[in-house]
Swiss-Prot record:
Biological process terms in GO annotation: DNA replication
GO cellular component, one term: host cell nucleus
Species, as recorded: Human papillomavirus type 16
Stretches assigned to the SF3 helicase domain: 451-601
Post-translational modification: Phosphorylated.
High-level lineage: Viruses, Monodnaviria, Shotokuvirae, Cossaviricota, Papovaviricetes
Name by which UniProt lists this protein: Replication protein E1
Length: 649
């Protein structure tokens, strides 16, 4: 019967790297037998006499050796043991793989014979717990290797901190007496793995504690927390845990292309390298963007990082960054941020000053800003370049300061406007508008509506002069004829006030006219005309009227020129006969034209109105002051900041 395929599994018959081979003796009957192979001869054992070790001879030989040879042998053994300790400490143990420990101990050749294809591709791990060199770190938490010696002397342990952990070894040696001995104590302590820290209930608290333990300062003392991950900022403070030494050394090179300023500190611990960064990026970034960037560059998990913006107004924090930046424990790249220089450099301390409200009021006046919120926002933006604005931000009464500034600015603006004539006011407004307008756009629009240009100029001249019975112009027409567009464009250019009849139930609905050079009432309806006919006849005449103003007694003033738009021609309607001679009516019968793209055919903007008034200046009888010299400004420059005396040496 044929033998079965394969092997029978008996010892020595498989393909294990070696084989049992039996000797084949070819001998026939009658052949001469060699004396060496005579099986009939008796074995007396005399041929093995030379291989027997005689203990007496060995002891005799040992006694004859010199003391120098014994010392040399013992010293060589001591050196071999010391080298072995270093190898076991710094070289990777062959038993690092737990699953292969048993096979490796039985026979290294068995592991070499493998029919499976092993993958040798390099795998990049975020956290790798390396073997310390003393055997199976995961199995043996504490291994003691002792060699008998005459004295037990311990030396301090040396620690090496790598990617996520390190090892600890103790070496002790001694000499004296009759013999030589040494003791090697190899102590493997349980390592605090960064992954185990992240699995705790409060990983951030553990990282904060470790940071304070290493750097001696609390991380929260250096940063101001951002609750939202979407909040953007250019300056960021970053603490990263569990970095490898090679990456920690290359951070400066990796981040230079992204930042303008870089401050790096790195310390080693049982978690690995802990790096503290102060970074000023080239553009504003949020926390999520920084996490994605650093997790790729530094090969660290976002959970192992604390990212917050630094404290910009803390002198203690600024001094910390300044002192560590000039020491040898930090690497610095780029120019120092201004918020550090402002609090640490002596010259910046000299430049600090107390807040002066007059400077803030002068700034608001020069920029024509009278709104509280706009003043607060725009003046705070000047803190980096304006010392008075910086002092304003340090004040604890910013709201009161802003309110006082806006109030004073409005007072100055109101007084300035009140002392100007209509000609001065139009010139003042023209100086604040760029050139390049076309006055013909306004003329063509009036002709399109059938308004004679010369009659409009005559009415406008009397309107601006405030002549009684000519102090009010009515733009009458159907819907969508451009009445409101024409009137609003003129109000915007002359910075007039607009009132609305919807507020007529209030006693103060006419208050905007008290501080205006020109006013407008848009879309007057029948109730509005009834109210005007009953209460505002003197106002339309341009005479003195009594007006109720908030927080002030009744104010007596002359009503400014008033422009009214309406779908009702009150100048001819029989319901209001007493308004007929008080209104100058212009009718707009045609619908306002637009081109195929939806843009107005006639542009009514500030530039065109400036060109219009400049072109018709003499026809409108607008005269400038005669004392104006060399085309200078007719109005002196307002200055509310007190003068400063020059110190003389």
């Amino acid at each position: 019967m044929a033998d079965p395929a394969g092997t029978n599994g008996e010892e020595g018959t498989g393909c294990n790297g070696w084989f049992y081979v039996e000797a084949v003796v070819e001998k026939k009957t009658g052949d001469a037998i060699s004396d060496d192979e005579n099986e009939n001869d008796s074995d007396t054992g005399e041929d093995l006499v030379d291989f027997i070790v005689n203990d007496n001879d060995y002891l005799t030989q040992a006694e004859t050796e010199t003391a120098h040879a014994l010392f040399t042998a013992q010293e060589a053994k001591q050196h071999r043991d010391a080298v072995q300790v270093l190898k076991r400490k710094y070289l990777v143990s062959p038993l690092s793989d737990i699953s292969g420990c048993v096979d490796n101990n039985i026979s290294p050749r068995l592991k070499a014979i493998c029919i499976e294809k092993q993958s040798r591709a390099a795998k990049r791990r975020l956290f790798e717990s390396e073997d310390s060199g003393y055997g199976n770190t995961e199995v043996e938490t504490q291994q003691m290797l002792q060699v008998e010696g005459r004295h037990e002397t311990e030396t301090p342990c040396s620690q090496y901190s790598g990617g996520s952990g390190g090892g600890c070894s103790q070496y002790s040696s001694g000499s004296g007496g009759e013999g030589v001995s040494e003791r090697h104590t190899i102590c493997q302590t349980p390592l605090t793995n960064i992954l185990n820290v992240l699995k705790t209930s409060n990983a951030k608290a553990a990282m904060l504690a470790k940071f304070k333990e290493l750097y001696g300062v609390s991380f929260s003392e250096l940063v101001r927390p951002f609750k939202s991950n979407k909040s953007t900022c250019c300056d960021w403070c970053i603490a990263a845990f569990g970095l490898t030494p090679s990456i920690a050394d290359s951070i400066k090179t990796l981040l230079q292309q992204y930042c303008l300023y870089l401050h790096i500190q790195s310390l080693a611990c049982s978690w690995g390298m802990v790096v503290l960064l102060l970074v000023r990026y080239k553009c504003g970034k949020n926390r999520e963007t920084i996490e994605k960037l650093l997790s790729k560059l530094l090969c660290v998990s976002p959970m192992c990082m604390m990212i917050e913006p630094p404290k910009l107004r803390s002198t203690a924090a600024a001094l910390y960054w300044y002192k560590t930046g000039i020491s040898n424990i930090s690497e610095v790249y780029g120019d120092t941020p201004e918020w550090i220089q402002r609090q640490t450099v002596l010259q910046h301390s000299f430049n600090d000053c107390t807040f002066e409200l007059s400077q803030m009021v002068q700034w608001a006046y020069d920029n024509d800003i009278v709104d509280d919120s706009e003043i607060a926002y725009k003046y705070a933006q000047l803190a980096d370049t304006n010392s008075n604005a910086s002092a304003f931000l340090k004040s604890n009464s910013q709201a009161k300061i802003v309110k006082d500034c806006a109030t004073m600015c409005r007072h100055y603006k109101r007084a300035e406007k009140k002392q100007m004539s209509m000609s001065q006011w139009i010139k003042y407004r023209c100086d604040r508008v760029d050139d390049g307008g076309d006055w013909k756009q306004i003329v063509m629009f009036l002709r399109y509506q059938g308004v004679e240009f010369m009659s409009f100029l005559t009415a406008l001249k009397r309107f601006l002069q405030g002549i009684p019975k000519k102090n009010c112009i009515l733009l009458y027409g159907a819907a969508n004829t451009g009445k409101s567009l024409f009137g609003m464009s003129l109000m915007k250019f002359l910075q007039g006030s607009v009132i609305c009849f919807v507020n007529s139930k209030s006693h103060f609905w006419l208050q905007p006219l008290a501080d205006a050079k020109i006013g407008m009432l848009d879309d007057a309806t029948v109730p509005c005309w009834n109210y005007i006919d009953d209460n505002l006849r003197n106002a339309l005449d341009g005479n003195l009227v009594s007006m109720d103003v908030k927080h002030r007694p009744l104010v007596q003033l002359k009503c400014p020129p008033l422009l009214i738009t309406s779908n009702i021609n009150a100048g001819t309607d029989s319901r209001w006969p007493y308004l007929h001679n008080r209104l100058v009516v212009f009718t707009f019968p045609n619908e306002f034209p637009f081109d195929e793209n939806g843009n107005p055919v006639y542009e009514l903007n500030d530039k065109n109105w400036k060109s219009f008034f400049s072109r018709t200046w003499s026809r409108l009888s607008l005269h400038e002051d005669e004392d104006k010299e060399n085309d200078g400004d007719s109005l002196p420059t307002f200055k509310c900041v007190s003068g400063q005396n020059t110190n003389t040496l």
